[in-house]
């Protein structure tokens, strides 16, 4: 039986999140987690993203792709930060969108989530950001990430 929305709220409300925070959350909870992406509490919306990233189900992965298009910056940051834990194709789809996000914080987390397992197109985007992004700090982060990806 799926956890109710109040049960999920309670479970995700740990002051200091740990693995236990996401324990027992699975495919039956995806719809409730989707509703939490719009919660007025930003921290709860971001924890819903991280909970979705722990679920090995297609509907959870599609919810994460949708989260990457959220109007809420904190939800997009959480989607970017969780991209490195997802299957490569889903990670590529999320990172392709978020590496071009207008918010530097979102781009920073997308850069940091990119790895050698991502597609050539995503890795090439890191190289482009490292060379030409208008934000000096993001260029530096991208340069470090590009170097890290290139190392065996």
Language model feature labels by segment:
Residues 1-7, 25-38, 57-69, 88-100, ...:
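Amphipathic alpha-helical scaffolding segments comprising HEAT/armadillo-like alpha-solenoid repeats
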Residues 131-152:
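Eukaryotic acidic, Ser/Thr-rich intrinsically disordered low-complexity regions
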Residues 40-41, 71-72, 102-103, 134-135:
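Short inter-helical turns and helix N-cap capping residues of alpha-solenoid HEAT/ARM repeat scaffolds
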